[in-house]
Amino acid sequence: MRLSGGMRLALVAVLMVAGCGRLIPDTLPPPGARPYPTAPTGPLPGPSVYVAPGTGVIDRPIDGGTLGRLRQATGSAAQCEAELAAARVTFSPTPDRVNSPTCGLTAAGVLGPDLGTVARMTPGDVTMTCALAAAVSVWRRQSVEPAALEILGSEVVAMEHMGVYACRGVRNDSGETARVSAHARAAALDFSGVRLRDGRRITVRGDWRGDDPEARFLRRIRDDACRVFGTTLSPDYNAAHHDHLHLEAESGRLCR
């Protein structure tokens, strides 16, 4: 059978389409393929706890309710870290660890600079519990710094201390006892003095006694500490504390 010219052209077109059909990708996914995840339609999850800047416990003046507010604000690690972040206090959490049956770190971290103040801890970058870091930050901002300006007429540039974390027992006038110290949990700071911008150095060892401005300053911040820390011990307590204030951020209520 002879094909006319029009029929031959139609047949060629059909064959070309049939051959090219193999080059068109299949629109169906291969067997077993998983679809790409879709973008979330709601808001992304944020921090588990949020404290607005300037509204936390660290930015509130010390009063009769400070200790209770601190205990509430540091009831969980997340809440405590949020309080520090809101106040621009540098705190880097560290892993929990156990060094002995009575010594170790839980909910602790490294307290770095407080970006809202001038005073720096000396030595710096101190490992302590988050609760202690929050209490120290309240005391520094709301007591130590303003009291120095009011009584001594100069800014505090350094807060000196004798350490925080130490695996040992409680010390008294007779030496170390069998009772485990809060230092064994990094929950207590031994504060020894301050350095001022004008160059003066005020120490518990050298300036506690008397009624001069230096002694009044130290007693003022000790009295304020009693409303911030669960335990505050000074040279008035015993000879073992003749050169420092023992500041403990745990349950209890002892001020001497």
Regions found by a protein language model. Give the residues of each.
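Sec-dependent bacterial lipoprotein signal peptides
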Residues: 1-18
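Bacterial Sec signal peptide processing site at the extreme N-terminus
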Residues: 20-38
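Catalytic cores and adjacent binding grooves of peptidoglycan-active enzymes
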Residues: 23-27, 134-135, 145-149, 160, ...
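Short Pro/Gly-enriched beta-strand edge/turn motifs at strand-loop
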Residues: 169-176
